[in-house]
């Protein structure tokens, strides 16, 4: 929005960090004056996010969600993806877990479930030598997910599971069969299938 653009400009030129506190106080006062106006709450979340206060922003999202009961789930989902992109893996996992706790009937459950496992895969494999127990547990969780998510939603799960099997657990043949079966079942969009086939080539090379 125009207001956010202006605030962004002001914050970018805030040399000594004094403006940030003034803006926060002003928004909080507005929220107290008009508690029903969600735009001020969203502005506060945006402000915290700009300042890198992700924990505080996420707590604010939870508070709105509990108060309004509807509509905030997609905001939390988007925020979780943003946290993941900023490598805030633990906070992202927490955000998606919060959504999953709402139950399988919830409209964002599937998306949260897939993102949760995708981040768990990224987090587990981001260390130099992941613990074998962690890898086996991850493999089991991804395998269970494969039977639960819809066919067209399974790309991220398959991609993670193939990588875990082939490059961490030395289960090359299982990884190859998983890819071949998934292609046969038409689980992928054309661009996803290209990536998976390149992965298959890497595994064949490893397997020789």
Where is each model-derived feature located?
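Acidic, polar-rich low-complexity tracts and alpha-helical solenoid repeat scaffolds
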Residues: 1-208
